[in-house]
């Protein structure tokens, strides 16, 4: 199966957009960390597994609850991209 991680790259970009819109510095730092984590997933030879993607989804949702306005929309888009990628991962 081809390994197209474009959805993960899009998710990282959306997390960056959410970070730029975040009013709280701590939340912005968490978004930056999440974006970096997603980028690392795009650069490793091994595909992320369902467990990693589930934890990532949980962490994005947790931060999303602390956002408002455009930042919420960007975080929601990031979640959609992670879910789309997860559908391509074999297993569970």
Feature map (PLM): residue ranges:
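Acidic, polar-rich N-terminal leader regions of halophilic archaeal proteins
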Residues: 1-92
